[in-house]
Amino acid sequence: MNHTETKMLAILKKLKASHGGISVKAEFEAEGTRIDELYRLVEIARRADMKIALKIGGCEAIRDLMESKQIGVDYIIAPMVESPYALSKFIEAKNKVYSLEEQEGTEFLFNIETITTFNNIEVMMKIASDNEGVDGAVFGRVDFSGSLGLGREEINTHKITDYAIQAAKLAKTAKLDYVVGGAVSADTLPSLKEIHSQYLTRFETRKIIFNADALDSNNIKDSLIEAIHFELLWLLNKRTYYQVITEEDNKRIDMLQSRWNILSGEDLI
């Protein structure tokens, strides 16, 4: 591990020990996490005794599910599941890749991130809670707001919070885990606490997932700052990693290009 990764590990240990942090999160979907990046994240998380959550590329992303199983992901989230049929395809896909025994150590969740999903939510919660269904749902506030034509500045309004609470009540009735994420910051705390008063299992920033009870802690704002610190270090570490790869071949490229120009008498490009 390099110096930056050592700092990241220290943050994760701190979050787990006294801030309610339970998992690190990556995305094959919007974030476009590459497999080598994911391996680095997994190693750091495992050393901190943290779980791994991964948002796959879609409801029927078989390849992503296979890689998730090989890596040993703890939470798998399917994005943009907007209809009962899409949810059934996710359930079919995870049952194809994971045996019932293998599913015992993994939680499968679907995203509630558009108004279309919300309009189908009662039927979808029933499907999700079937014996071979899924374990929970994640309310994604950013895309949900966007699906209503609202900007990020309106994410913390009562309108979005009310939708999240309605979904929370249905998840509670269905005995499913319920997670809220999307632009989570100190400004989000009143909204999250209101949702938590009804039902909430976990909440998440871009890279860190917290137990919902962390909202009752006096150091919750510090927890969110540490989550930002971790994400920033992760991005800096990723940038350095690819800069090193880029520099690896630069000298060889310069030498070969000069040789080409001399031998051919023309520019390569």
Map each language-model feature to its residues.
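Expand to "…catalyze enediolate/carbanion chemistry for C-C bond making/breaking, isomerization
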Residues: 1-269
